[in-house]
């Protein structure tokens, strides 16, 4: 399945626009990562634990969006947007949302 931020797919004709599809992931950030991130913030540097969590959440949101597109008969998602939000009383939760337009493009070998 082609997933792109572009509003079209070069060289492919969109045959049908299905609907907007979403993938949402909410994940908690654990205490040990918080301690490590705090030290890195103090001394400067990157928090690999947080970065890994962010990457995993983003990839899962995209997979979920793709699956929802497949479920309605689409073979591509265009105009993809990914949003991030910090939630919770202690800002201890991360929400990642992927959204796009599910479409059917002309026959392909993907």
Curated annotation (Swiss-Prot):
Q: Which Pfam families match?
A: YbjQ_1
Residue pairs linked by disulfide bridges in the UniProt entry? none
| Family annotation (InterPro entries) | UPF0145_dom_sf, UPF0145_YbjQ-like
HAMAP family reported for this sequence:
UPF0145 (MF_00338)
Family stated for the protein in its record = Belongs to the UPF0145 family.
Q: Which NCBIfam families match?
A: PRK01119.1
Protein name per its UniProtKB record: UPF0145 protein lmo0208
Name the species this protein comes from: Listeria monocytogenes serovar 1/2a (strain ATCC BAA-679 / EGD-e)
């Amino acid at each position: 399945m082609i997933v792109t931020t572009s509003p079209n797919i070069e060289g492919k004709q969109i045959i049908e626009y299905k609907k907007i599809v979403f993938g949402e992931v909410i994940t908690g950030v654990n205490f040990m990562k918080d301690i490590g991130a705090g030290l890195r913030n103090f001394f400067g540097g990157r928090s690999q634990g947080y970065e890994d969590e962010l990457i995993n959440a983003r990839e899962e949101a995209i997979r979920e969006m793709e699956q929802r597109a497949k479920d309605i008969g689409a073979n591509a998602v265009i105009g993809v947007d990914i949003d991030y939000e910090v939630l919770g009383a202690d800002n201890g939760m991360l929400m990642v949302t992927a959204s796009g337009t599910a479409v059917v493009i002309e026959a392909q070998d993907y």
